[in-house]
Amino acid sequence: MGKVYAVGVGPGSPKYVTEIVKEIVQNCDVLIGYKYTLKTIEDLIEGKEIYEITMNDQEKSYQKILPELGDRTLVIPFTGDVNFSESEVVDRLIEIFGEVEIVPGISSIQVAASRAKVPLDKSKVITMHVTTPIEDKKLELQKALIDGFSVVLVPRPWPKQPDKHFMPSEIAIYLRENGFDTTKMKVHVFEAITTENETNFEGTVKELEGKEFSDLSVMVFNQASLDSYMNYRWQWEN
């Protein structure tokens, strides 16, 4: 069988596609991906065999190409980084194709943290964007906030099943109902980050209640304070 790659193409802007991923995409024969993801790399895939998929029909495309791949190279592009919020799909690709080379990309998590000036080494990163139950992740969110960490979070859009829908408004209500004073909690919500349609809400968690955001949203709870090396003079002073 030919080579199979799972690659991250960044949050949405072609400027955030890494050079190694560009090279892999340009040299491949077949691509299987979502419309939004393929749009990010559209200038690199002209003339390729392309399968545009949805969550409902992706399995059909993987199974179709499996016996037809031969010695050709297949690329499955992912928005952001392959290693974040995509493990269920990557696991399935490994089950189907066996050897899959994973190439990371720049995540919306990284960009959102940078936009909000929140260092990841003082933050907890949580994704609710999974199909498995998220009750433990909700508790993880509470604990991180109580412990004083900033939190960079990917919410879960599931409008067809309200009990699973956990977007910024639902998260704000959840935190308030669990004893947090959301009127004093600072938060950013970025939508379509790095693209021409990027938006940034900045305010309190309380203000999120009743607001609608797209499925391309990332939240940043900002509890960071400046703590430079000048607070640790012992490193160079005798």
Model-derived regions: residue spans:
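Class I S-adenosyl-L-methionine
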Residues: M1-V103, Q110-V111, L208, S217-V218
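Generic hydrophobic alpha-helical segments
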Residues: S61-I65, E140-L141, I171
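Class I SAM-dependent methyltransferase SAM-binding "motif I" and its flanking Rossmann-like core
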Residues: S13, G80, F84-F149, E202, ...
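Structural motif
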Residues: G33-Y36, T54-N56, T79-D81, H129, ...
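A contiguous loop/helix-start segment that scaffolds small-molecule binding in enzyme catalytic cores
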Residues: G2-A6, L145-N238
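A short acidic, often aromatic-flanked loop/helix-cap motif at beta-alpha or helix-coil junctions
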Residues: N56-Y62, S108-I109, T131-I134, T194-E198, ...
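Generic domain-boundary/flexible-linker signal
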Residues: E42, S61, S85, I134-D136, ...
